[in-house]
Amino acid sequence: MLFRSRAPQWTGGGVVFAPVPRDYEVKMNKKERRAALKSALTSKVQENKLVVVDSLALAEAKTKEMQKVLTNLKADKALVVTADDDQKVVLSARNIADVQTATVNTINVYDVMKHNTVVVTKDAVASIEEVYA
């Protein structure tokens, strides 16, 4: 046999530098994560980009109603934070471009900094203060 069929230069041969699955995850301490989120929220407050609302009690789960609420708040690219998983808010906001919903337990620094405005309910503010204060 003059050649090896598994050599990379032959049809059906191997790949020279094949992609290798890599884990790009970086461990971050709890205190660092909390401090980063505190800093991000403080930054939004200083820029007047954090809006506190009494509640987001929508009559129905309609995108149009959520759009009206966000237009009145002048929040075009917004992160809507609620205390618990409010299905009406989630269903109303999911079809609006550049609007994302989150609960107090699921917010992160990336989402806070990515959005221009952060809309938070009073219950969510109380929960955030309880956890991060």
Descriptions of predicted regions:
Residues 1-2:
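Short, small-residue-biased leader/transition segments that mark boundaries at the very start
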Residues 10-11, 15-16:
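Active-site metal-coordination/substrate-binding segment of hydrolases
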Residues 18-133:
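Extended polybasic, low-complexity segments that bind anionic RNA or targeting/receptor surfaces
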